[in-house]
């Protein structure tokens, strides 16, 4: 534990917390005065959502299920829009794509079994990271994601160096291991875990995508 805490203090990254726009329990936006607004920007009284025809407030299974579904969609959209991408996510996504290309066949479980077997030239991975970073910057400019503070101003090599420090700080198992001019993909499961942050945006392998 002491070693882990000591590593955390040495990291140049940190815990990122991002707050999305507030919503009420029906998915309407809420201003600083607590007033709810519907999708057309009109002020609404949330009490009206649970008031029956007789003017009584009460539960309605079908109605409430629909409200729950709509609220879930709003929360999921907000989560996507407020996703903060860090160097670990970018490097892991690029490395996992290199793993898939190197193995060349099979499914997720086949790829994950190739731990410590695939080595990628560092320059090749850096180029893949930069290509992915270009797409991420386009997404960020469109307001669909947010890039972490330690992503700005870095190229592919810089992001790899930052990610390697973060991996070694958070995990006892090595994720990417330098070997000469190469990086060995050691912990394929952690690479998959980190790259998942980009999967919902269509920028990494999505294990849940419909075939």
Residue ranges and their predicted role:
Residues 1-211:
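Membrane-interfacial terminal anchoring regions of lipid-handling membrane enzymes
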